């Protein structure tokens, strides 16, 4: 049975939307101007930035007395509370599994935080397994993390697909591992010339349909 490798944040769950929701509420609570949302989004860098950097940036910009540790926890809790599993995404995962695919999440991040996302949203019920960078000591785009995912699933990378939104981590990593890929464009244009996705889709449901139809 072929592997279906999946990114987590902004692929299976809308991490960007959850962060925006928290950020708007937080900025409103401290009386910051609405246009500061753009600054905060740039610091977060679509989740690629460190939560500690976001916390320190907020403390410095607004002279907040709250400790960095407490602010980091507030940010993480605020995002977690807003994450939801779209029922249509759950349905698409179930269809892919029924079609013979083995869904495995491959994600960069802290083990506790990423596992909490999987369990609190209910995604864990639709996956064969998951691989988290902190746990295995290697991050996307290193192809080793994809090999670990195959080992976890007792499968092979031959015939596998990777679905994700990050050009470097997901698509670059898949290319290095010799795996076909679907890039979730999210309204963006592909810019990288060294490698490219096998397919492009607007969202994860369309991406999963592409993978299922490829057999």
Residues covered by each model-derived region:
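N-terminal helical cap/lid subdomain that shapes the substrate entry/recognition surface
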Residues: 1-91
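Asp-based, Mg2+/Mn2+-dependent phosphohydrolase catalytic module
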Residues: 1-2, 90, 94-97, 101-215
């Amino acid at each position: 049975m072929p592997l279906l490798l999946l990114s987590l944040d902004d692929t299976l769950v809308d991490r960007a939307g959850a962060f925006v929701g928290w950020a708007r509420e937080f900025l409103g609570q401290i009386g910051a101007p609405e246009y500061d949302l753009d600054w905060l989004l740039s610091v977060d860098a679509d989740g690629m930035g460190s939560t500690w950097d976001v916390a320190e940036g907020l403390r410095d910009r607004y002279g907040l007395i709250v400790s960095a540790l407490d602010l980091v926890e507030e940010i993480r809790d605020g995002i977690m509370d807003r994450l939801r599993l779209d029922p249509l995404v759950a349905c698409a995962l179930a269809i892919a599994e029924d079609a013979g695919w083995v869904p495995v999440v491959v994600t960069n991040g802290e083990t506790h935080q990423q596992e909490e996302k999987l369990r609190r949203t209910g995604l864990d019920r639709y996956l064969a397994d998951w691989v988290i960078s902190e746990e295995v000591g290697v991050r996307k785009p290193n192809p080793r993390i994809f090999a670990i995912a195959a080992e976890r699933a007792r499968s092979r990378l031959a015939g596998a697909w990777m679905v994700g939104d990050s050009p470097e981590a997901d698509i670059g990593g898949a290319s290095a591992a010799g795996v076909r890929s679907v890039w979730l464009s999210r309204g963006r244009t592909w810019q990288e010339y060294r490698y490219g996705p096998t397919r492009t889709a607007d969202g994860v449901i369309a991406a999963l349909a592409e993978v299922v139809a490829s057999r």
